[in-house]
Amino acid sequence: MASQTALSARSAYRQLLRATRIAFQDDVRVMIAARQEARRNFDSHRREGIDTPMQINHALEVANILRHNIVQGVREQDDENAKWELRIHDDIERGDNDTIRVKGKTVKVDKACSS
């Protein structure tokens, strides 16, 4: 029977693989590279140690960032002046600059950025 730490590590690894599939859906080259890097990191920390819970937490945080904060842009390969199209999926975190809080205070925007 596997230990709780091993089960947590497997769960984190699976979440990381799912996050790479979502974040890099149409970019096979980048998705494979990200998965190879995840595998390399998990293999290098195969033995359980003092920092294992921190490593598992790090993997979960990376998966969360990949899933909620990474947006890929594409444009036509032949046209350098083509507009970029962003692939925004349902899990992407959305917000605007007016909702950012600084030191617990709401930021008030008085003028447009181009002014």
UniProtKB/Swiss-Prot annotation:
Family: Belongs to the complex I LYR family. MZM1 subfamily.
GO biological process: mitochondrial respiratory chain complex III assembly
UniProt name for this protein: Mitochondrial zinc maintenance protein 1, mitochondrial
Record has RNA-binding as a keyword: no
Protein's cellular compartments: Mitochondrion matrix
Alphabetical list of InterPro entries matching this protein: Complex1_LYR_LYRM7, MZM1/LYRM7
Role: Assembly factor required for Rieske Fe-S protein RIP1 incorporation into the cytochrome b-c1 (CIII) complex. Functions as a chaperone, binding to this subunit within the mitochondrial matrix and stabilizing it prior to its translocation and insertion into the late CIII dimeric intermediate within the mitochondrial inner membrane. Modulates the mitochondrial matrix zinc pool.
Keywords: Chaperone, Mitochondrion, Transit peptide
Span of the transit peptide along the chain: 1-36
Quaternary structure and partners: Interacts with RIP1.
GO molecular function: protein folding chaperone
Gene Ontology, cellular component aspect: mitochondrial matrix
Superkingdom, natural source: Eukaryota
Organism: Aspergillus niger (strain ATCC MYA-4892 / CBS 513.88 / FGSC A1513)
